[in-house]
Regions:
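An alpha-helical support segment within catalytic cores of ATP-dependent transferases
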Residues: 108-167, 222
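Conserved short submotifs of the Hanks-type protein kinase catalytic core
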Residues: 69-82
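A conserved alpha-helical element in kinase catalytic cores
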Residues: 26-68, 86-102, 197, 206
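Regulatory N- and C-terminal appendages and interdomain linkers associated
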Residues: 1, 263-279
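Active-site activation/catalytic loop segments of kinase-like enzymes and analogous catalytic loops
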Residues: 196-226, 235-253, 267
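Short, flexible/disordered intra-domain loops and linkers
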Residues: 34-41, 249-259
Length: 279
């Protein structure tokens, strides 16, 4: 038997590629409620989502689950691949862009019931109202336009409406490249909405990891049918979310996530400043 821990990501639990005595392989993720009280429910949700995805979806297949004594473990098909290189390589980014397009096509209309992306923006993927009420110190530009940012993010729930099942957490550490194909992994946050929302949420992490600027990434993605004001509303909500959550204490077992959110928040904020032309 052999187990090799896999680096990356923000889960406080085990993530390992495992080879059993009979030579079979799988990828195992497991967590105890003592490590983080919220993560076991995320593993359960991921099992529900992945087990219901159609065979055409480019995902690692769920093989088994274990849920007992405060521990939840999931066994997935072992994908012999790698996460995208950092800094981003142009060929791998193009592969991801094409793969995410295909995934959206396969998952439209949604094959499963799930919460709406708009509900997420209405309840927690936002932050400007929180930052305003807390009187938190802000970037000069954000402070100048704080009321407008509050109003703009309030439009995001309606803007996000759609009938595609979105991964809703697309980042380099949530994908594997193997055999010139991209496999999208880690599905607990899946929601139903408009595909453009996925691209907007993905873009700040690409630039943070030394890929193209968000607007350059959007030029790789045909979003001609989406109004600029709708795009700006979602970017505003994402920026507010990242910046507000970055000020909170880190969740148990995930000490680095707030710095990750802060970096993406600053990128999203600068992106929004450039798009709005507000000075």
């Amino acid at each position: 038997m052999e187990a090799v821990t896999q680096p990356g990501g923000f889960s406080p639990g085990l993530a390992a590629r495992v080879r059993t005595r009979d030579g079979s392989r799988c990828f195992v993720k497991a967590v105890s409620e003592l490590a983080n009280p919220d993560t076991p429910s995320l593993h359960r949700r991921e099992a529900e989502v992945v087990s219901a995805l159609p065979p055409e979806a480019s995902v690692a297949r769920l093989l088994w689950t274990y849920d007992e004594g405060g521990w939840v473990a999931l066994g997935f098909e072992d994908i012999d691949g790698h996460t995208p290189a950092q800094p981003w390589r142009e060929d791998e980014l193009r592969l991801v862009v094409d793969g995410l397009h295909r995934l959206h096509d396969v998952l439209t209309p949604t094959p499963i019931d799930s919460a709406a992306a708009g509900d997420g923006f209405a309840t927690h993927i936002k932050g400007w109202s929180e930052l305003k009420s807390s009187r938190a110190p802000l970037d000069t530009w954000a402070a100048r336009y704080l009321d407008q940012l509050v109003d703009l993010e309030a439009q995001a729930p309606a803007a996000a409406a759609g009938d595609t099942l979105l991964h809703f957490d697309v980042r380099a550490d949530n994908m594997l490249i193997a055999r010139d194909q991209v496999f999208f992994i880690d599905w607990p946050w899946a929601r139903i909405g408009a595909p453009f929302v996925e691209w907007l949420a993905f873009a700040p992490s690409v630039y943070m990891q030394h890929g193209p600027k968000p607007e350059e990434l959007l030029r790789m993605v045909p979003l001609a049918a989406v109004d600029d004001s709708v795009i700006n509303a979602v970017i505003a909500s994402l920026a507010g979310y990242f910046l507000a959550y970055a000020r909170r204490p880190p969740p148990p077992g995930i000490p680095t996530v707030r710095a990750f959110q802060a970096a993406q928040g600053q990128i999203a904020l600068e992106w929004l400043r450039e798009r709005t032309g507000w000075r």
